[in-house]
Amino acid sequence: NGGFPIDWTEKGDSIRNAVIKENLEIEKKNREAMMHNRSLKDMSEKDRKKKGMEEKEILPYKTEPALFYKQMVEAGILGIIQASEVPITTLYDRKNIDKLSFDNLPAIPDIKLDKQQYAIIENMVDRREYFQLEFDIRNHFRMGPVKYHNVIGVMRGTEYPDEYVLAGGHLDAYDVATGGVDCGNGVSVVMEAARMIAEAGGKPKRTILFCLWAGEEFGLLGSKYFVENETVPLEKISNYFNRDGGPLVPTSITVPPAMYDDFVKVCAPLAEAHPDYPFTVNKRQGEPGARPAKAGGSDHAHFAMNGVPTLSFRLTDHKGYNFSYMEIWHTERDTYNKSIPEYQDHSSTCTAVALYGLANLDHVLDRTGLYKE
């Protein structure tokens, strides 16, 4: 499995039924092939070649998670166990979620198990041994609707209070772990950048918004609401910095030519801010890409779809800690200890410097050449 629950919708049933039907055809062909191959055993190699007869291939069966799911549920199974790669990935019930109500809540536990533990069980089944399995499963359902809340910190601009620079990360995480990286690494950097500017007595000319978004994992819900309801005028946003990836360190940023001089000025302090982490501003080469037409990826998406600049730092594992994002992405290893403290510290510095610098320009960033018009 890839982490998603079993699709028990009508579409899922139809996919499984099609696979079952195809497997019946494969079974028929395999029986014929086995009979043919058996007949060749009584023939000499010379006779086989003379008659042009060779062994037929035994075809593999098609696979699909819980192929006989509907039939097993009707037979009264108590649960499903699937083998999982380690670290175990769990994803939300994307295919079933729109069909769920309090009247048809899931009744069959869908268990993702370490593939090595699964193999022990599978071998016992193959040996036709009797055994019992016990799982302690604690799922709780609550009557909706469930409210989601964005948390927005506001540092009001002294000269251009109705113009904005934003930074953000998302508050929610998958329950399989604590979200220490996804997106604790983003939330903590945004909060620390806010603290640094405030403690330094910063008085930005332009308003800075420190955004902690709700519901990113379930469809960018918080940032989508913010953009679609024009919580602030989108044309007044200079840039939105999104942090939702590994706990790595900013070492450069690439910007359109029209923004290059501004970013060189704003990011100048970062070139010497830390001796271990050089920082460069790069001018984008070539033609701009098209404005995104669909949302995806992270909370920058709806801003970008509406033409708001969402330029972000290039992050690197500069000291070679060998961080692997896919090791933590929606897995049981997405915990606090996977963050890299020194990278987080410097990321906060970079974010604070960039936010404060853009907020203190005498103009919002020029969007010329940001996207292909």
Specify the residue positions occupied by each region the protein language model found:
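Soluble non-cytosolic domains of exported or imported proteins
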Residues: 59-67, 112, 116, 180-188, ...
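Structural recognition of the beta-strand scaffold that forms the well-ordered cores
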Residues: 1, 78-83, 110-113, 152, ...
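His/Asp/Glu-rich mid-to-C-terminal helical/loop segments that flank catalytic regions of hydrolases
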Residues: 102-105, 109-113, 120, 195, ...
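Short alpha-helical segments and helix-capping/turn motifs at coil-helix boundaries
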Residues: 62-70, 74-75, 138, 150-152, ...
